[in-house]
Amino acid sequence: MNYSFTERKRVRKSFAKRVNNHQVPYLIATQLESYAKFLQADKPAMSRLTEGLQAAFTSAFPIVSNNGYARMEYVSYQLSQPPFDVKECQQRGYTYHSALRAKVRLIIYDREAPTKVKEVKESEVYMGEIPLMTENGSFVINGTERVIVSQLHRSPGVFFEHDKGKTHSSGKLLFSARIIPYRGSWLDFEFDPKDILYFRVDRRRKMPVTILLKAIGLNNEQILANFFNFDHFSLTANGGSMEFVPERLRGQLANFDVLDKNGVVVIQKDKRINAKHIRELEAAKTKTIAVPDDYLVGRVVARNIVDPDSGEILAYANDEITEELLATLRDAGIKQLETIYTNDLDSGAYISQTLRTDETADQMAARIAIYRMMRPGEPPTEDAVEALFQRLFYNEDTYDLSRVGRMKVNSRLNRPEMEGPMVLSNEDILDTIKSLVDLRNGKGEVDDIDHLGNRRVRCVGELAENQFRAGLSRVERAVKERLGQAETENLMPHDLINSKPISSAIREFFGSSQLSQFMDQTNPLSEITHKRRISALGPGGLTRERAGFEVRDVHPTHYGRVCPIETPEGPNIGLINSLALFARLNEHGFLETPYRKVSNSKVSDEVVYLSAIEEAKYVIAQANATIDKSGKLADELVSARQAGETIMVSPERIDFIDVAPSQIVSAAASLVPFLEHDDANRALMGANMSRQAVPCLRPDKPLVGTGLERIVAVDSGTVILATRGGIVDYVDANRIVIRVNDDETAAGEVGVDIYNLIKYTRSNQNTNINQRPIVQAGDRVVRGDVVADGASTDLGELALGQNMTVAFMPWNGYNFEDSILISEKVVAEDRYTSIHIEELSVVARDTKLGSEEITRDISNLAESQLSRLDESGIVYIGAEVEAGDVLVGKVTPKGETTLTPEEKLLRAIFGEKASDVKDTSLRVPSGMIGTVIDVQVFTREGIERDARAQAIIQEELQRYRLDLNDQLRIVEGDAFMRLEKLLIGKVANGGPQKLAKGTKIDKEYLASLDKYHWFDVRPADEEVATQVEAIKSSIEAKRKQFDEAFEEKRTKLTQGDDLQAGVTKMVKVYLAVKRRLQPGDKMAGRHGNKGVVSKIAPAEDMPFMADGRPVDIVLNPLGVPSRMNVGQILETHLGWAAQGIGKRIDEMVRQQVKQAELRKFLKQLYNETGRIEDIDNFTDEQITVLAENLRQGLPFATPVFDGATEAEIGRMLELAYPEEVATSLKMTPSRQQMILCDGRTGDQFERPVTVGVMHVLKLHHLVDDKMHARSTGPYSLVTQQPLGGKAQFGGQRFGEMEVWALEAYGASYVLQEMLTVKSDDVAGRTKVYENIVKGEHTIDAGMPESFNVLVKEIRSLGIDIDMERN
């Protein structure tokens, strides 16, 4: 096995039974690939595929002017380099974007000969700014990181459904069909309770479907021929004869005696015709059956019947036959007659009945009827009618089925080919109606809307493309109007195209769309989950109110595609989902999941991705099926799935097998160990709460994990990976310099990688992002190794919480109802201390009365308040501040006091500005204490920078220069090494220090020279001389390149900042706030076991073990049985074993046991069960490092659905606690419980207690952020009642029920106070305030404002109401 540099330092013992060769794919690949497809930035212009921007351009262009004399064509587009990098955009509040320029060609034709080209103009046109995706799949919009969530919407195509009997009181199923395009009008077909078929366009008024059939060019005869089989009759003088078709007679009631051709009665009247009768008729070789007139009456004529002599139409298609009609036909000598065949069972007369309700005569009349429905009130001219009908379904500009839609339509209508036109054809409409009629006749099944074959995912790229198209279509309309003037006014393409609509459409989408969300950045897991989220909400999707139970439910096709566990609780449940671990999108946007191929019950390594539609055809076994040594399925019957049903089949019938047991869950759920032992509801809470864990100051890897911790940490982008292999040259807290291996450097590029670490940076949720190096100078790393840890990661593994020793027992009521009792030792060790970074900003504006000024010179401020400010009036970095302290001094001009004429004159003479200023400094908000860690000053172009701003720029430049110098140092070092090798032993023609001609160059000589003088040595060999020259010029070129880069950086930093209108200067101050654990903070395990800290007890009061160690946390045992999350108990036991093994290794290291013994113990641990680790290949030094890292505990991986068994946990506990240790600790024989003692009395508790180690998280619901109190504050405008909520500095609502409580106590004065002076009696509350200030404590309650509001409300209804005063 290959271990990376960091993996080797601490190997996780895995209990996985199944070796999974299929790696978990890159977790944010869907986002990155989708946007890369949209931009196609790395492809040359001419070889771009028609998708994304390219598709939008090609669909909008060419644009032809209305008169046809000018035409604009699209050639290609290109994206420029972004002006600022991601970090600069975040600091300055810019959008990380690239400018889009399109090359466009304007062709003007000759008016005399319209085919002749008069002139062609080509130019590049600016098309707006396109935001770029960062390498981690997010966007920086106005300085904040955002994520575009993928949307799950109904796939375009044709769908058949019924109303489940809800519409009509009889419970009759009403069938309907709907053709949904990607863009354009929806076409619905539906039956009503009387079995008449209607259609509607875009949910408008319904009309009989035959109007549409006539509009597409069918007449009544053709309509009937398309939907019915015909019965053929020959008329005789009385009665007639019917062609004998056996299958149409079976099951009918004979209403006359049926005779065979010999005149023998085969079926008597009023008998039901059965198979025996049919056989008898066939045996008698019956071709026709004689029928009486009664049998013909009431049937429906299939074709127009024309009198052969006069040409008069005697009967129209769809007329019913009457006795009179039969007489007329006989008189006219008509011998043959065709009627439509219908019966009540499987061929109803629906279309025939619909045709009777339809009053339109021909195609034009039908189209006019459709026009009147779509455009009521407009006069239908022939051209307008024709144009509208074409635009509805047949025009590529207005109607687009898309490739997906065409594929879905063709497959649903059972056609062999999957390609076709992107607009509707008459066949599509006809086949859809036929299928719907078949459904009504009992043939076929309705579609399942929630099947993942009928719902597809729209990713970032597609959503952005749709917005771009919308913007482009607005541009197109404007260009079309102006193209006519292009020739007369000699305009260029860029004069015609205005890119504003495109920019605004894109900006609106990224800035304020429902799917563009503020990135959840609490910890790395929440980041990665947010990017893998799939929402059914948003434009073109569902709404919370309309979504029923079915849409939200878990569907069998979710298996391996969408996680059944991870979804929010509350109104969005089931509408927002997470992508499963291995799922990906196919070219059509449907979710696929991988399976390994099985042939003849042998499992191969070939992996096939199947979509939900394809999967239904196969029998698929689960990943935990038993496989023998030769790779064959071993059991006689294997549990498998087929079309969503679970079945037991023989191994030969299996087509595929799952790639991994964790295939069905998402990233967050797959991090929960023993997930298989938790109840679904609690598993959901566990997965959701992991995303709210606050990064701790000292991250601690979970002792019991699932093996995915490393994958999630690496894919989230929080850790730094080596982009190329090499040797670590230099490390400090801020940067890592790696000298790259020669074979990984391309010719002419710098063989050095510099990684600048992110230090104490604020995340979107105000948590702290900080990276720490985990390599040392001299370490050799390979590509992809972790070189620095980020927030919530420990040695490249995700570490969301801390490993706590827990005991399950009640403790004096302090863990009643999920409360948590915690030891003071945990707080003292800073285990759960987290740093939160607050950004506070202040702006100086130009006001009517003059400019605001940022200054230290503020009157009426004590020197103690100013002591932390520098001469520019900005706080120093490192200052410790608390609520009310000034961070940035600022003064604002105040309105002039009225001046006497004399003063005015003096002001006018001496030109003094307003002297009155008020103090509007930035102060620390209430309830906040912290340290200033960073200050940023932004100054508008043209305004002089203050000393502080210049100092910040200098510092930034110095840091940049340091990076360049490092690169140069390594480049020059390499060059001089090559030069030395080149020169030593060569003969010189001369050189510095009067080197004689013909002397051999040696090491001593070179050492005596300054390195830069080596180039002055003149080698005798011409070739060597050229090589020396080449090295010299390459160094000079690099120097020049670095100097240019430095100058570019300087220009960027010194140019003015782009601030809002009227703002001259902006200062941002960053405060680091340290939050220790305290009562009221919310904590949780990974199994949905959450609670609030009730008390932090002294360590000496906590229950302790026989060896004197107190436990860290005491949890209530009653929280487990009813919640059914037993996973936490198994985690506790396995964590206990992990800690015990760590103690044993620690003992071995301290006693300095022999390497062989240590190796033997490690092999016993790693290789008895589960995955085999390659311990033999470790060097002694690596074993020492490994053992050092295992002293805190041996980390376990128990993968989801493939984890440790009870026997394995038991075995690990035995290895951790040998007999003598277990006895000394008073453990039960299973080592899962022990006798504890009460910390306060020292007495033993009477029963053994479950003790172990659990990974516990501190959640982002901290009491500091929630604690709030109000004295006086803002009031609502209308009701004059206090506002609510901490953000508004609101009060606590005294509601209806609270009023009842006071009424019940008879506390009338308290009640009066609550409802008047403490709430909305405006005069009363002002008076009370004044009284309190004076020291009097009296109340004058008046009329509450809300009573006046009620009176006004009643008056507005026209009822005069007045107060009676007595």
Curated annotation (Swiss-Prot):
Principal EC category: transferase
Gene Ontology MF: a single term: DNA-directed RNA polymerase activity
Record key words, sorted: DNA-directed RNA polymerase, Nucleotidyltransferase, Transcription, Transferase
This enzyme's EC code(s): 2.7.7.6
Coiled-coil segments on the chain, per record: none
CDD domains: RNA_pol_B_RPB2
Gene Ontology biological process terms in this record: DNA-templated transcription
Protein family (similarity comment): Belongs to the RNA polymerase beta chain family.
Function: DNA-dependent RNA polymerase catalyzes the transcription of DNA into RNA using the four ribonucleoside triphosphates as substrates.
Assembly and interaction partners: The RNAP catalytic core consists of 2 alpha, 1 beta, 1 beta' and 1 omega subunit. When a sigma factor is associated with the core the holoenzyme is formed, which can initiate transcription.
NCBIfam families named in the record: PRK00405.1, rpoB
Protein name: DNA-directed RNA polymerase subunit beta
Gene of this entry: rpoB
